[in-house]
C-alpha cells in the first residue's frame, strides 16, 4: 500500500491491502486443483489468459491508487503503463509460483507476505514517497 504515512486513510488502505493478500492466498489454496490446472495446463483453453486478466485488474487498480495519491496531495513520480504491468505481472507470477511448485499453504502464506513487504517498500521507493 502506498499512501499518506501516518494518516487514518493510510492505515485503512494498508489494512485492506494486507487483507487482500491473505484473501488471495486463501482463495487460491481453497481451490488449489483448479489453480494448478490454470497455472500449468490451461494453454489452448478458455483459461489460458486467466493470469493475464488478473494482472490487468491489478494494473488498473494500481493506476487508480496512484491517481488517488495525487489527489490526496502526494507528489508521486510517474510510471508508464509498461512498468506498472511488469510489476503487477511479477507479483501475480510470484503467487502462481507457489501453485506451480506445490508449495504447502503455510509456506505460501509466508512467501506472499514477503512479496507484500517487498512490493510495498518497492512502490514507495519508485514512486518517490518517503
Kindly label every feature range from the protein language model.
Residues 15, 19-33, 45-71, 82-89:
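Amphipathic alpha-helical packing segments from all-alpha helical-bundle domains
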Residues 75:
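Short, charged amphipathic alpha-helical segments flanked by flexible coils
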Amino acid at each position: 500500500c502506498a499512501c499518506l504515512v501516518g494518516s487514518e486513510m493510510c492505515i485503512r488502505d494498508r489494512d485492506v491491502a494486507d487483507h487482500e493478500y491473505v484473501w488471495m492466498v486463501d482463495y487460491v489454496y481453497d481451490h488449489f486443483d483448479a489453480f494448478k490446472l490454470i497455472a500449468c495446463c490451461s494453454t489452448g483453453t478458455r483459461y489460458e489468459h486467466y493470469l493475464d486478466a488478473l494482472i490487468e485488474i491489478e494494473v488498473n487498480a494500481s493506476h487508480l491508487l496512484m491517481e488517488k495519491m495525487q489527489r490526496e496531495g502526494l507528489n508521486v513520480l510517474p510510471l508508464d503503463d509498461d512498468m506498472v504491468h511488469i510489476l503487477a505481472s511479477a507479483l501475480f507470477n510470484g503467487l502462481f509460483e507457489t501453485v506451480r511448485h506445490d508449495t504447502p499453504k503455510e509456506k505460501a502464506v509466508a512467501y506472499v507476505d514477503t512479496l507484500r513487504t517487498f512490493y510495498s517498500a518497492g512502490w514507495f521507493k519508485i514512486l518517490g514517497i518517503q
